[in-house]
């Protein structure tokens, strides 16, 4: 389960999506995530799936990596579906048993929430799969650069966010190593109730925190050794510059979001339900 979390991992390969400006990927990902919350139709999610599937194909990231990232949220998905299925009221009653009632609106809401969560995770994972940590930091810093006029530490904020994302797979790998070492010593993380499992995690947390602080200290020393003193006066070997493909990506994403919005607002329910 730990190794299935893919957010923060980078998949190096040459593709059209990898070659896009990091700012384009960040903004387009945010627009895609926003579009998921204005979806109000099954057809809208079909279009979202086709859009995301096309981008995944163009990125050359294996589909198994995207699917792998969905495994950690299976329990959350099941919980969300069950809660919405039995607690949402409205529409025709499809099934009634004891105190449980399943309605048409409950089925619709549970399916929508499950699809939304899967698309959220897949879209976010794809951005980190196709954007290097340095590119991600440069893109965020450039997007937030107008805040420099307010004397906000934009470079430092972008650096912190980039390091935090980069540390996710590192800490997950470290957790996996510690768990395997504890299991080899006879530790049991699977049996027992919730409290017993929580207590069993204590031998993992202590060495994990020690390792995290050690890695953070090593990173700080490496940055100091390279005379890093923040973003002031710092130059880049490859300055970010928009190209034709970046503008095309913006245009395609805006058309997609606009189409989803129009579909949800102006197309009658019975037209798009199937």
Where are these regions (language model features)?
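Small-residue-enriched core segments of transmembrane alpha-helices in multipass membrane transport
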Residues: 50-57, 70-78
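Juxtamembrane/interface alpha-helical elements of multi-pass membrane proteins
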Residues: 73-187
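Interfacial helix-loop-helix linkers and transmembrane-helix boundary segments
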Residues: 62-70
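Transmembrane alpha-helix interface motif
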Residues: 1-42, 48-59, 145, 149-152, ...
């Amino acid at each position: 389960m730990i190794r299935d979390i893919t957010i923060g991992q980078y998949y190096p390969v040459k593709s059209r999506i990898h070659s896009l400006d990091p700012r384009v990927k960040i903004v387009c990902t945010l627009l895609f995530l926003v579009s998921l919350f204005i979806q109000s139709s099954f057809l809208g999610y079909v279009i979202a799936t086709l859009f995301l599937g096309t981008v995944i194909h163009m990125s050359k990231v294996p589909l198994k990596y995207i699917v792998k990232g969905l495994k950690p949220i299976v329990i959350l998905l099941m919980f969300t579906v069950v809660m919405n299925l039995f607690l949402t009221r409205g529409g025709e009653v499809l099934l009634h048993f004891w105190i449980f009632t399943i309605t048409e609106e409950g089925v619709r809401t549970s399916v929508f929430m499950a699809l939304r969560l899967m698309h959220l995770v897949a879209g976010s994972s794809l951005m980190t799969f196709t954007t290097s940590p340095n590119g991600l930091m440069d893109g965020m810093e450039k997007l937030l650069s107008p805040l420099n006029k307010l004397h906000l530490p934009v470079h430092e904020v972008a650096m912190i966010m980039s390091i935090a994302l980069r540390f996710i797979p590192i800490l997950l790998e470290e957790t996996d190593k510690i768990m395997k070492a504890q299991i080899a010593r006879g530790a049991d993380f699977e049996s027992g109730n919730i409290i017993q499992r929580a207590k069993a995690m204590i031998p993992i947390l202590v060495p994990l925190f020690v390792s995290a602080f050690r890695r953070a200290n090593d990173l700080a020393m490496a940055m100091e050794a390279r005379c890093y003193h923040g973003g002031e006066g710092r130059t880049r070997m490859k300055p970010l510059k928009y190209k034709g493909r970046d503008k095309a990506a913006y245009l395609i994403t805006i058309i997609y979001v606009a189409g989803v919005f129009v579909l949800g607002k102006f197309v009658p329910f019975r037209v798009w339900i199937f």
